[in-house]
A protein has these predicted regions:
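FAD cofactor-binding and catalytic pocket of flavoenzymes
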Residues: 1-2, 67, 188-265
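Conserved redox-cofactor binding core of oxidoreductases
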Residues: 1-126
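Short, low-complexity, polar/charged sequence segments that are solvent-exposed and flexible
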Residues: 22, 82-87, 140-142, 146, ...
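Helix N-terminus capping/helix-initiation residues
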Residues: 43, 145, 232-234
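A short, glycine/Asx- and small/polar-enriched loop/turn
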Residues: 79-80, 132-139
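Sequence-level motif detector for i,i+2 pairs with an aromatic at +2
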Residues: 87, 136, 200-201
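Glycine-rich loop(s) and the adjacent beta-strand/alpha-helix scaffold that form part
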Residues: 98, 115, 124, 128-132, ...
Length: 265
């Protein structure tokens, strides 16, 4: 990239303070420290795994609590947004009525609305980005009304493409012009290729026989994880990239019997 991390760091800090990140300052070179509020705690089995891992691999494979955009200790900037502390309900996917985790609904849209300069356009499906061949830059977006199929163009000095993995690729592929006949920025036919997702099926589980005299209480919206450790500073395998692994330890409830033989016989 034509910019350094040092150029981005103050802006990372600015955004992280506004968003509200919880976690620890772990001092991991390939996972720079964030501006954090207190992180969530590990339970006894997770701490056991952490200690065993660090004994085996020292600092090569760090086990840390996941950093997440949940308010464990709201600051004034978050209270100004109308947000409250995370209640640890782990019902985040329903949308948090307390604004405990960062989202456009709880934070940036209300904040932008305070300026008086925000216009929200409902039912607008982005079709493509408008590229001006003469100016040599993007100048707007083309949207389609989901109800009427009417196409409208909106122009701006700055355009943010925040459509997640698949739709960002699709929008860029749709954004053809004389300069980019195969899609905006797609000079090398890379758009739409090499898209990666979390490997949700790549998991292992085990039963730990100890710590039966201990228990943990409450919930937690994040997990423990091991940041990427393969091919970080040197190539160690015959492929590029590495792994970032998450794990959690818990005491199973009565529903564990669902998957056991003999139930219902």
């Amino acid at each position: 990239w034509p910019i350094r991390y040092a150029d981005l760091e103050p802006w990372y800090s600015y955004v992280e303070k506004f968003v509200g990140i919880c976690g620890d300052r772990d001092g991991i070179e390939n996972l720079p420290d964030s501006e954090v509020m207190p992180g969530f705690a590990l339970n006894c089995v997770e701490k056991h795994i952490q200690e065993a891992n660090h004994r085996r691999y020292q600092l090569q494979r760090r086990v840390i609590i996941g950093r997440c955009a949940h308010l464990t200790q709201p600051q004034d900037i978050h209270l100004q947004q109308g947000r409250g502390q995370c209640q640890n309900r782990t019902l985040c996917e329903r949308g948090c009525p307390y604004g405990g985790y960062f989202s456009s609904v709880s934070s940036t849209i209300p904040w932008a609305n305070k300026t008086g300069n925000l216009t929200l356009i409902p039912n607008a499906v982005v079709h493509s980005i408008i590229y001006d061949d003469t100016l040599g830059k993007a100048t707007g977006v083309r949207v389609i009304d989901a109800l009427t199929n009417q196409s409208t163009e909106y122009h701006a000095k700055i355009i943010f493409v925040n459509a997640a993995t698949l739709n960002t690729n699709l929008i860029l592929l749709n954004s053809t012009s004389g300069r980019f006949p195969k899609g905006l920025g797609n000079d090398h036919d890379i758009l739409g290729h090499y898209i990666a997702f979390h490997n949700y099926r790549g998991n292992v589980s085990a039963i730990h026989e100890d710590y039966k005299d201990q228990y943990y209480y409450g919930r937690r919206p994040t997990q423990v994880f091991i940041p990427s450790f393969r091919n970080v500073f040197k190539k160690e395998t015959d492929f590029q990239g590495g792994y970032m692994s998450y794990y959690v330890a818990y005491r199973p409830g009565w529903h564990k019997g669902y998957g056991r033989q003999g139930i219902g016989e």
